[in-house]
């Protein structure tokens, strides 16, 4: 398949790499050369790690790289796409603008997928003239190693689109779980309030950062504590997702005060080297 990934950030780079390894032709699109260069470097780092671990033979890596096109040319990249995966910032208005633009640029038969973690697929589909071709494919970070993809069907998404999107995900060696088009879907609907309450435990002085994380590492056998996980996801992503959930589900999803403050200070977790932990 000819895949286009819109956005070369953490998620877009991972989706691009995984699609290349699966044998697809991939164009990754950014709006700024600096962001595009950063994305290319992330993709290159994935290949380097794969080679170092013996996961990918060098010949396969070079062949996969030959199928990558990195570009600032949105319309040109989308012209012959079979499937487009949007992976831009988690903001409904931003994504709607991208989908309206995709609708004009991509072939009429192309599937338009969003990597949104919480935003209504029906809403995004309404920004296009082909809502039956719009579907949610929520990948998890880091994409190359995480085996799950949530598939979200909008109110007008066709069964043919769902089937084709599922087949694409399966070529990546990942498992599909289906979710109704409800804000937050499965994972984030449950995960984000868990992280938010853990931050409130810290805000209220119930326990220390280290002990909160240790409690879930040892008491619930989690691989990562909730505060460390928030840093890994990105505090800006956690905050934006909670705001979307709050808009639809009410005050129980209101972001913790310290989370709002940290994001306003540019403390975004691992991506900015500062969050609940320093990196």
Predicted segments, located by residue:
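A general alpha-helix detector
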Residues: 46, 147-148, 194-198, 225, ...
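NAD(P)-dependent Rossmann-like dehydrogenase/reductase catalytic/cofactor-binding core
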Residues: 8, 22-27, 159-163, 170-181, ...
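NAD(P)+-binding Rossmann beta1-loop-alpha1 motif at the extreme N-terminus of oxidoreductases
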Residues: 1-49, 53, 105
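Rossmann-like dinucleotide-binding cores of NAD(P)H-dependent redox enzymes
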Residues: 28-62, 153-162, 176, 183-191
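Rossmann-fold dinucleotide-binding core
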Residues: 111-180, 185-189
């Amino acid at each position: 398949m000819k895949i286009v990934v819109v956005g070369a950030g953490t998620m877009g780079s991972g989706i691009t790499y995984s699609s290349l390894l699966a044998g697809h032709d991939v164009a990754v699109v950014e709006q700024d050369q600096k962001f595009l260069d950063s994305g290319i470097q992330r993709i290159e780092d994935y290949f380097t790690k794969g080679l170092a671990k013996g996961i990918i033979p060098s010949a396969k890596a070079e062949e996969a790289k030959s199928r990558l096109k990195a570009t600032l040319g949105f319309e040109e990249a989308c012209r012959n796409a079979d499937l487009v995966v949007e992976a831009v910032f988690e903001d409904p208005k931003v994504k709607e603008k991208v989908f309206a633009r995709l609708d004009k640029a991509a072939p009429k038969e192309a599937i338009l997928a969003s990597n949104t973690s919480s935003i209504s697929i029906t809403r995004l589909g309404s920004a296009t003239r082909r809502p039956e071709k719009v579907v949610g494919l929520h990948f998890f970070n880091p994409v190359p190693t995480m085996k799950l993809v949530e598939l979200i069907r909008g109110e007008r998404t066709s069964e043919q689109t769902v089937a084709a999107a599922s087949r694409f995900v399966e070529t990546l060696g990942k498992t599909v779980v289906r979710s109704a088009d409800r804000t937050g879907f499965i994972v984030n609907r449950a995960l984000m309030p868990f992280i938010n309450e853990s931050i409130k435990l810290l805000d209220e002085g119930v326990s220390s950062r280290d002990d909160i994380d240790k409690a879930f590492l040892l008491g619930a056998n989690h691989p990562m504590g909730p505060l460390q996980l928030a840093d890994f996801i990105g505090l800006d992503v956690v905050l934006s997702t909670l705001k979307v959930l709050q808009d639809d589900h009410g005050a129980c999803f209101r972001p913790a005060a310290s989370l709002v403050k940290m994001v306003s200070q540019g403390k975004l977790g691992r991506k900015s080297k500062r969050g609940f932990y320093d990196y």
